[in-house]
Amino acid sequence: WNAYKVHELAEKALLRAHELGSSNTWVLSNHDIIRHATRFGVDGTFDTGKWFKANRFNPKVNVKQGLERATAMTMLLLALPGSTYLYQGEELGLQENMEIPDELMQDPQFFRNPDLGLSRDGCRVPLPWTASAANAYGFSTRDVEPWLPQPDGWGSYAIGPEHDSDASMLTLYQRILRSRKSLDAEAPLE
């Protein structure tokens, strides 16, 4: 988390796209990496592989800091020219599920190299739609176990409660996206 480094990376990407006559594509999270709201909640430089191997508890994640930094980075990316991809659940402020036991892992990467303990399943957990844990937090129409377990408290990130709150991450994303839509995409960068 370094403002100079972020500026340097964005500037290089923008200049390179300009040289090539193309546009940029920005992304903070996807189905193969730790959710950015979790990554940004860890201070300092750390090895993601070692973090997974250590059951993802060392260093500890500062959830509040992660969400604040994720919000700042999202606002920055959505202000930049080009396309921005949003990964499912980031608009809710979802954290990485770091509590999936080995016996419930689904990721082929985990089974190919079990000694490494690496899995991408923590960012692939079904989204919470309702605050109630019933029916996999509303992800299903029946009371069934989802293919990956949802962590306790997942309902606090649910779409329903977030939709009803002016202070929620979902509402913030909606406001930012409306603002982005109103920007002049053809304006030169200064």
Where are these regions (language model features)?
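Active-site and adjacent substrate-binding regions of carbohydrate-active enzymes
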Residues: 1-190
